[in-house]
Amino acid sequence: MQLPSFYTKTLPLLASALLSLSTFAQTKKAPYDMTIDGVKVIVQPSGNEIVEIKTLIKGGVQNYPADKAGIESLAMNALVECGTSKDSKNSFKDKLDKVSAQLSADAGRDYSSLTMNCIRSDFSTVWPLYVDAITTPLFDEKEFQRIHQDAINILKAQASQPDYSIDKMAHETAFAGRDYAKSPEGTEATVTKLNVAETKAYYHSILTRSRLLIVVVGEIDRSELEQKVGALLAAIPAGAPFTLKRERFDPTHNSFKAEKKDLATNYIQGLTAAPQPGTADFNAFSLAARIFYDRHFLEVRTNNGLSYAPATWFDGGLSSSFNISVSTTDPNKYVAVLKALMEKTKKQGFTAEEVKNMKTTYLTGTYYRQETNGAQASALAANEVLHNNWRRAITLNEDLKKVSVEDVNRVFNKYLAHVTWVYQGDPAKATADLYTQVLPTAEKLPPSKLSTQKN
């Protein structure tokens, strides 16, 4: 298989960048972890003047019932928007602005986090504010009403966005009855019912040392960290032992669910099984998913003109899945093209050249994204929570070297067996049987709609 000119021109540059970034990583002090009051603290010396600290609360959508979806997102936002016992919202933000520091909160399906970012010389000023935000948030009634209404307005706006709507339907259908069916930001119905008292009580119920993980990227002495983190954790109860649940998504048959919507085109999303984080198949499947993205894009858009932005992606969370997404006016032709492509890929496999090139592209992109302290902290945190191995963020280069072409082809065949499809648009244009039947055996792709004549 001959490589496109893009690859022949850029692969040497990518390899050079990867080598430079790897060399830079090796010059920094070695990362380490320690346990303080039962909480793991991961420390990556940064070699620069920026300090990034991320405190994670594990559990995500496992922490609340479906009728309370959105409560954790609202609570985390309140930590940075509703003041503390010592400062009003304005006073709190003014103190951060004076030293150009930032505090930010996030709530996801697997964990939530509160992050601080500042320069090393301001650490002693910002750290007490960070501790107050975690341990004594005010949950001021007036400020809470503001962020509560903001959350509702965002959900209303998202409901009218087809890409958001189809993804929400896909999760609710594929993971029905499971935690991953819940959306971290909730729904308009669930969030509207939430009030300041129950949101505050909920936050304090999940703020336990048994759920925490702390990640530090910066140049801070170990003794100073031990003292400051120890004081922080002394104000937080131990809580009951907590173990993250890992639920495998593995549909046993193809399914198709349609919802009529008045849209300019039709939106389709399918979910298949995928390896869970921390398993032997994960890295190989990550490569397979990325290569298939390129093949899918080429076949669906370039060769058949069926969609402007076809996509596939590997969601490697605690309930992992492989996602296929497209918007098209010809859903029946699309599924025929997709099935033929999947079958051809299963029969003929990915090539050694494709796997080699994707390793380089994947690693280079990963290292570039980890140039900032924030990106490094996020990578360390995700790998610890999902893979139970924070060092994977550092060893990925060596880990991928061990993945063979045979591994990549094996996992693609293993996991892409059955698809849970959802559809929004005109149901009359989609034949459900085409989506639910077993994959065809034909290797020949439907002919391209695009002309191959050169200008």
Q: What are these model-derived regions, one by one?
A:
Residues E81-D87, N117-H148, F314-R369, A442-N455:
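M16/insulysin-pitrilysin zinc metalloprotease superfamily fold
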